[in-house]
Amino acid sequence: PTITNDGVSIAKEIELEDPYEKIGAELVKEVAKKTDDVAGDGTTTATVLAQALVKEGLRNVAAGANPLGLKRGIEKAVEKVTETLLKSAKEVETKEQIAATAAISAGDQSIGDLIAEAMDKVGNEGVITVEESNTFGLQLELTEGMRFDKG
């Protein structure tokens, strides 16, 4: 069995028989996948927000609200939230800040420290690849130049 609290991993496992429920589940899967693709984190938050938007949207439409008006309202709200978030965003600059941010995202301080070390070595424009291993523990491997896995 897999134990996870990652929204995208959980969403991938949802399989429903009812066609209407299946549509909803596919919507949630898409929200989680797109969030994971774009941000790499926040899938659980995105899933909860999607559920709230759908629930309240359906409730408002059932009460007689115009669906297109709701859509326009949601789009305006998204613009405002995005603007506010960008204004309050802070650049993560120091190795300690990177480690703290990565540790929160990974849910593990040792992984956060390793990612901060990797970023310190490759810089902001470098590439970091995380792979699963058959061995126990964490390992950092630095490859200078280019690396081709297949050719």
UniProtKB/Swiss-Prot annotation:
EC top class, in one word? Answer: isomerase
Cellular compartments per GO CC: cytoplasm
> What would you give as a GO molecular function for this chain, any one?
isomerase activity
Localization (cell): Cytoplasm
Q: EC number(s)?
A: 5.6.1.7
Catalytic function, reaction form: ATP + H2O + a folded polypeptide = ADP + phosphate + an unfolded polypeptide
Mention one GO biological process in which this protein takes part, according to its record: protein refolding
Q: Which residues form a coiled coil?
A: none
- Hydrolase listed as a keyword: no
Which keywords does this Swiss-Prot/TrEMBL entry list?
ATP-binding, Chaperone, Cytoplasm, Isomerase, Nucleotide-binding, Stress response
* Binding residues for ATP: D41, G42, T43, T44, T45
What's this chain's function? Answer: Together with its co-chaperonin GroES, plays an essential role in assisting protein folding. The GroEL-GroES system forms a nano-cage that allows encapsulation of the non-native substrate proteins and provides a physical environment optimized to promote and accelerate protein folding.
Give the quaternary structure: Forms a cylinder of 14 subunits composed of two heptameric rings stacked back-to-back. Interacts with the co-chaperonin GroES.
Recorded family membership: Belongs to the chaperonin (HSP60) family.
The identity of this protein, by name, is Chaperonin GroEL
